[in-house]
Amino acid sequence: MDEEENSEINSVQARNEDVQLEDQSQSQGLQDRQVDAIEQAWNDAMPDEPSPPAEYAFHDPLAIVGEGGDAPEAMVEDVLQDDTASEGSHPSSDMSLESPGSEDDSDVQGLPNWMIPQNRLRSAVDMMVSQARNRDGGIAALLSGDNFLQRVRSMVFSQERRRSRTSEETSQEEAAEEPDDPPPQQPPLPPIDIGFDTNLPAEHSYFGNHLSRVPGVDYLEVGSVHHMLIFLHHHILFPGEVLPFMIDGQMFDDDMPGLDGLIFGVSFPRLQPPEDNPHKLYGVTCQIYERGESGRGLVFYKSRALQRIVINCDDIKGSPQYIARNPTNKCFSNVKILPEYFLPEPLQSVDMGSMARFRDIPSMRDKYRRFQLSTTTWPSDACQEYSFGSIVERARQRLESQKIDTMPKCPIQLSFWLVRNLHLTEKMMRLTFLTDSVNTRLQLIKSTFKDETLFFCRYCNSSLALCSDLFAMSKHGVQTQYCNPEGYIHETNTVYRVISHAIGYSGEPSTKFSWFPGYQWHIILCKFCAQHVGWEFKAVLPNLTPNVFFGLSGSSVRIGKASEYSPFNGTTYVVRNMLRMISSDME
């Protein structure tokens, strides 16, 4: 009897185990079908036509005007912001301090064949989510499986291999067809005359016409130490730059340093100090030269950077705040004025006696120089290498296309002016700021004359525009600081055009608080990561040229060499956006 009961119990347990195995098999099959559906949707999103050759392509303002067309980009949709950006916090994105985080990749034809359009990617994710909700455990159970993550990684890497293979095949075909020809260059930009008063942006007239002039400029003695109010700034300012800002008027007292305009210090946390002085902050002194009431409890100020300073962090009293974020607490510190050493050209120390009268005669200048060289032991190449005049002439030739006619003659001011208008890399900007020698600063600048540089998105590293397309819409140069209605300060770089398919648009165009009178502004976003990178400016008044240009925000772009250029850099973008969409649907 006991044997019969045990046999019946064993048979029941066996049937239960079979049912459990069958349920597990069905569950695993459902998971495999869901992953297969994702992979099929992923593969369906891949077009079969070959990728076009990787060349520079641009939004040409002349072509837009000639064709009479409007901006071709569609309005972008909201997506999550990039929490892996290099900046700690995403800055204000437009002139009204709204923060768009949007993108529209529905234009499939504008993408390379290896990159998955976001609308198809979203459809695939939505299908996976809807199927996963019909089973026990939901999406969390699906994502917990190693099989799913392995399949996702496999799909992503397969697209990367396909992209690399396509690029190699394209390069080989181009090399076979044109073995002796150089690589394709960017299309030349037709010369455009500036039909705009470049004095208007420099006056910051968007603040209004009620500003009062504050006379006087005070230069402090080199090496002296002064106690003054200090702020932080997210951009590096060089002496000579104008810093407009909006702040509570109670932050400044009448008894602060300055014979006429108030003097305060601005330091740059992004400027890494030398290794031997890790507890130092570097910055500049700024002096207010115009101010006026805004009517909202804040005061508009226009200030100019004067001298470089260094601050010992141990001397700071209080918590320093960013000047662009409406600071409410005062912070004081002792600051030391840094020197500017300039050595004249070597040949100027050679006394030629009565022959010196020929030095200033243009027709005799070259002969006089050769005669000077014959009396010294220095080779002519060495003298030419350190000649201030040769550096100025080469810089003038490089900046000729930017239509800048305000190049200073003072070597000290010129060295800072060239840094702002030649757009050096962040590493080079740091070196030029920290050096006390004007000659060394000019030599560092000269070493960059042969480099071709581009603007890259600071968030996803995609290329946006060529630095050779910079031009001056302000008499101060191609790079100028502007302030929006909320007090946020934007470092803006003006370019004729941007690389095609590199940008999208957000919001509606507006003429309110325009930094360039007669132009409307429209927010532009990076096409890959949907982060704010600047504005498009389009003329709304007749007889203004250029009709269209772009302003790139310094906090959203970085300068890099042309060797870093890649037509598309979307692998990280694809993975990040897919995982963020899955995460958002799980919440």
UniProtKB/Swiss-Prot annotation:
Q: Please provide one cellular component term from the Gene Ontology annotations of this protein.
A: nucleus
Cystine bridges: none
Query: From which domain of life does this come?
Result: Eukaryota
Ranges of biased composition (kind: Acidic residues): 170-181
Q: Which UniProt keywords apply?
A: Metal-binding, Nucleus, Ubl conjugation, Ubl conjugation pathway, Zinc
- Please list the residue ranges annotated as the CULT domain: 452-561
In this chain, the stretch annotated as Disordered covers: 1-56, 78-113, 157-195
- Gene Ontology terms, MF aspect: metal ion binding
The alphabetized list of GO BP terms reads: positive regulation of neuromuscular synaptic transmission; positive regulation of Wnt signaling pathway; protein ubiquitination
Record field: compositional bias (Pro residues) = 182-191
Comp. bias (Polar residues): 22-31, 86-96
Q: Which pathway does the database say it acts in?
A: Protein modification; protein ubiquitination
Return the Basic and acidic residues bias intervals. Answer: 159-168
Q: Where are the transmembrane segments?
A: none
The UniProt record lists the Lon N-terminal domain at 227-453
Function field = Substrate recognition component of a DCX (DDB1-CUL4-X-box) E3 protein ligase complex that mediates the ubiquitination and subsequent proteasomal degradation of target proteins. Has an essential role in mediating growth by negatively regulating insulin signaling. It also has a role in maintaining presynaptic function in the neuromuscular junction synapses of third-instar larvae.
**Subunit text:** Likely a component of a DCX (DDB1-CUL4-X-box) protein ligase complex. May interact with pic/DDB1.
The record's comment on protein family reads:
Belongs to the CRBN family.
Protein name (Swiss-Prot/TrEMBL): Protein cereblon
Naturally occurring in which organism (per UniProt): Drosophila simulans
Q: Which gene encodes it?
A: ohgt
